[in-house]
Regions:
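Flexible metal-binding regulatory segments at protein termini and peripheral loops
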Residues: 1-127, 225, 250-251, 331, ...
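Juxtamembrane coupling segments of multi-pass membrane pumps/enzymes
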Residues: 2, 183-186, 192-193, 208-269, ...
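Conserved ATP-binding TGD loop and adjacent catalytic N/P-domain core of P-type ATPases
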Residues: 16, 29, 269, 433, ...
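Conserved cytosolic catalytic loops of P-type ATPases
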Residues: 25-43, 48-49, 202, 233-327, ...
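Transmembrane helix-loop-helix hairpins at the membrane interface
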Residues: 88-242, 353, 722, 748
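Membrane-embedded alpha-helical bundles of multi-pass transporters
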Residues: 112-126, 155, 174, 413, ...
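Conserved catalytic phosphorylation-site environment of P-type ATPases
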Residues: 291, 350, 385, 398-472, ...
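P-type ATPase nucleotide-binding
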Residues: 451, 455-585, 595, 607-623
């Protein structure tokens, strides 16, 4: 996705106009415009100059972010988010208020409260009117932006919020000016009664008040919008500006842009680590809270990786740079949060559709309102006041901001806690999952076997047993051997030398130590050389039932004991599973392990269902079957789980560390904590609730406000002065943004208020997984080949694949962006229109289906 800065947008109608204009450019496959960040993301083969020209033709400005680079630097991105509007609006507001207060004194102070006026104005109604006109002109000149933008947009037949304000203020000013000239004529004729009548028709103060109040609203909105990007700007400020590198045997402090890959850099206590790297020398505790949300420092020593913007707290570190510039973990996180803000959530389509026709509809309603009241015999002033009220109370901004402000705050809050949502759609969909499928290794468990128990035989000490095991296992490459070596190292043991070492495939190990034959391995293997008591055999069976691997060791036919090794469950896994289940989510564990081990791990973790003995391609098939029963999130380490992560409705990569750009995942969790999964779902649900509240307020406000402004409730004695309409319009956007900012107070790790989602009833024809598999094999599959335009990368393939496989009749979809095709395997006939719609809803073009 190529990103652009867009200038000149003032409301949702503007962003809709830009999006529509760019989408028409040949070669553009998708376009998403963010009013909140004044940015635009474009995918496709169209040249940047063509896209910029299209934006300019629509009446707005555009520039390529980062001077053509795919990802702008942190400094450039921070500058783009800098709040330049609030200071300008503040100056405009102060000048406007100064003239408005004087205008209100002349127009209402003397008449309503008897405030004194200069003698010159006594009975000089024309002078009074001219003074009000000049003061109003001053306010209009100060706020000329509304008129320039509004009438230019109207001329281009793409009216926006500024158009409504400009029309309302112009109508009030124009009618008041007419009344002033008419009053002047009446005064020349000596018609005192007509003079007073026309003077009551002055709406100069309404025109000035409308402009001033809208400016108040714009300033509050700009200030609040600035706060929604605080999390993102906070991340950008973490980026160090300099680094201390070794050059020609000397330490030099250089700008961060000059650090290159494989440079050697040093970090002293209290300094921020400048780039991603690997520790060569030294040891320290590093605070990674800025990137992962982890409050406790992490110990680092030679061979460990470090990330940019984390803080070295205690020791001296000498490191080699591995990722610099835009490739660092921090830069990727910033880019991911920016991309999420630049994309649109599916729920935003409702507001987009309304925003596209909102302003023209409001203008039409205002015109009809004015005409109807005139036909009903009301005065021009009364009818015009109703029409102006309709114009100034209507607020497309509240609709346009309802979704993006909540997405920005939600994604920023997630980033601060080590939870990264790649797109707005992933932030929305995560909270809607019904089933969470968990990979076992590295997700539920630590992913590294550990010694859990030492069971020495009678007359043998634990140290003796472990020393014999160490002597055998030191030459083995087996993962279980590494667990024994780690335990021996922790206990301070050193390995004895052995000879005649042999590894017997599938059985165990044998070697000679000090003339004594050592054997180690499975019960079946060791029992051929040493006598194993029934009690020890029973203990081995019990260990196996618990999902542990019992390793037996003997010396010259004498049993030394048993060492139990297992991939242990992470401390937070059972609690995380409980939280998911309390949310009403079914938890399934997928693993390639044997049934017995898998059942033991599943029982310890507390999952609802265990599916064992599945390879990566088997996980893909299982996810497809699970999706028949609801929305599925697949949680894995992103290494061998890529097919399943892609197949699921939401792919969550856990423990990604520095690899935050995993293509297959929709959500990336920086830490290896399963507890971040319910936290991500909790945050998604809170964000979705916030969006619903914002949309409800925006629709409710306009649904109630427009009829009130039009005078529908006049028979009940309720009318709305245009000034109050402008005040309401100003507050509506402010309320929406303020509500979104409440998300910053949300405690995403607190399960206290978790609610269960209502699950969709299973369809009557949904068979159990085993029956479904049989049915699919019995049917002869049908295939269709789709020609698709607009796919550019593996991510495009994944998007199209997921869209097609969401159709119940589709068994599989093989997508190639290089060939521009999707080969769809069907279990039953499906209409071509359904296939086409699924792809084109994702903004790709279907050229044909065979």
């Amino acid at each position: 996705m190529t990103q652009y800065n867009v200038t000149g947008m003032s409301c949702a109608a503007c962003s809709a106009r830009v999006e529509k204009a760019v989408s028409r450019v040949p070669g553009v496959t998708s376009c998403s415009v963010s009013l909140l960040t004044n940015s635009m993301g474009v995918e496709g083969s169209a040249a940047p100059q063509d896209i910029i020209a299209a934006v300019q033709a629509a009446g707005y400005g555009a520039s390529l972010k980062g001077a053509g680079k795919a990802a702008p630097s942190a400094a450039e991105a921070e500058a783009a988010l800098e709040d330049h509007e609030t200071p300008k609006l503040k100056r405009r507001l102060l000048w406007s208020l100064g003239f408005l207060l004087v205008l209100m004194y002349f127009s209402m102070g003397h008449m309503m409260w008897g405030w004194p006026l200069p003698a010159f104005y006594t009975d000089n109604h024309v002078a009074m009117g001219l003074t009000q006109l000049l003061l109003t002109v001053a306010v209009m000149v100060i706020n000329q932006k509304f008129f320039i933008s509004g009438f230019q947009s109207l001329w281009r037949r793409a009216p926006n919020m500024d158009t409504l304000v400009a029309l309302g203020a112009t109508a009030a000013f124009g009618y008041s000016t007419y009344a002033l000239f008419a009053m002047t004529g009446a005064q020349v004729r000596g018609d005192t009664e007509a003079v007073m009548t026309y003077m009551m028709d002055f709406y100069f103060e309404s025109a000035a008040m409308i402009l001033t109040l809208i400016t108040v609203g714009k300033m509050l909105e700009a200030r609040s919008k600035g706060r929604t990007t605080d999390a993102l700007k906070g991340l950008m400020k973490l980026a160090p500006q300099t680094a201390t590198v070794e050059r020609d045997g000397r330490e030099l402090e250089v700008p961060i842009k000059q650090v290159q890959r494989d440079d050697i850099f040093v970090v002293r206590p209290g300094e921020s680590i400048p780039v991603d790297g690997v520790v060569l020398d030294g040891a320290s505790a590093v605070n990674e809270a800025a990137l992962t949300g982890e409050s406790l420092p992490v110990d680092k020593a030679a061979g460990d990786t470090v990330s940019a913007a984390t803080v070295n707290q205690s020791g001296f570190l000498r490191c080699r740079a591995t990722r610099v510039g835009e490739d660092t973990t921090l830069s990727q996180i910033i880019q991911m949060v920016s991309d999420a803000a630049a994309t649109k959530a599916p729920i935003a389509k409702i507001a987009d559709r309304v925003s596209g026709v909102f302003v023209p509809t409001v203008i039409a309603i205002a015109a009809v309102t004015t005409a109807v009241w005139l036909l009903l015999g009301q005065s021009v002033g009364f009818a015009l006041a109703r029409g102006i009220s309709v114009l100034v109370i209507s607020c497309p901004c509240a609709l346009g901001l309802a979704t993006p402000v909540a997405i920005m705050v939600g994604s920023g809050l997630g980033a601060k806690n080590g939870i990264l949502f790649k797109t707005a759609a992933s932030l929305e969909e995560t909270g809607r999952v019904d089933i969470v499928a968990l990979d076992k290794t590295g997700t539920i468990t630590a992913g590294e076997p550990q010694v859990t128990e030492l069971l020495p035989a009678d007359g043998v000490s634990e140290a003796e047993l472990l020393r014999a095991a160490l002597a055998l296992e030191q030459k083995s490459e087996h993962p279980l051997a590494r667990a024994i070596l780690a335990r021996a190292q922790a206990d301070g043991l050193t390995a004895d030398e052995v000879t005649d070492f042999r590894a017997l495939s599938g059985s165990g190990l044998t070697a000679v130590r000090n003339g004594q034959t050592l054997q180690g391995g499975s019960l079946a293997y060791v029992s051929t050389a040493a006598e194993v008591s029934p009690a020890m055999r029973a203990r081995c069976e019990a260990l196996a039932e618990d999902g542990k691997t019992p390793l037996l060791f003997s010396e010259n036919g004498r049993l030394l004991g048993v060492i139990a090794v297992a991939d242990v469950i992470k401390p937070d896994s059972p609690q995380a599973v409980r939280e998911l289940r309390n949310m009403g989510i079914e938890v399934v564990m997928l693993t390639g392990d044997n049934e017995r081990t898998a059942r033991a791990i599943g029982a310890a973790a507390g999952v609802d269902r265990v599916i064992a003995g599945v390879l990566p391609d088997g996980k893909d098939a299982e996810i497809r079957r699970l999706r028949e029963r609801g929305k599925v999130a697949m949680v894995g380490d992103g290494i061998n789980d890529a097919p399943a992560l892609t197949r699921a409705d939401v792919g969550i990569a856990i423990g990604a560390g520095a690899d935050v750009a995993l293509d297959a995942a929709d959500v990336v969790l920086m830490k290896s904590r399963l507890s971040d999964v319910p936290a991500a779902i909790r945050l998604s649900r809170a964000t979705l609730r916030n969006i619903h509240q914002n949309l409800f307020w925006a629709f409710f406000y306009n649904t109630l406000g427009i009829p009130l402004a039009a005078g529908v409730f006049v028979p009940l004695g309720l009318t709305l002065n245009p000034m109050f309409g402008a005040a309401a319009m100003s507050l509506s956007s402010f309320c929406v943004v303020s509500n979104a900012l409440r998300l910053n107070l949300f405690k995403l790790r607190d399960p206290k208020h978790d609610q269960k989602r209502r699950k969709k009833p299973a369809s009557a024809n949904t068979a159990p997984a085993e029956e479904k598999t049989t049915t699919e094999k019995e049917k002869k599959p049908m295939k269709k080949t789709m020609k698709i335009e607009g796919m550019m990368c593996a991510h495009c393939e994944a998007t199209v694949k997921k869209a097609l496989e969401a159709i119940p009749e589709v068994v599989d979809a093989e997508v190639s962006h290089t060939a521009g095709t999707a080969v769809v395997t069907l279990q039953s006939p499906v209409d071509d229109a359904a296939l086409k719609k699924a792809v084109e809803d994702k903004d790709y073009k279907v050229l044909g289906i065979e």
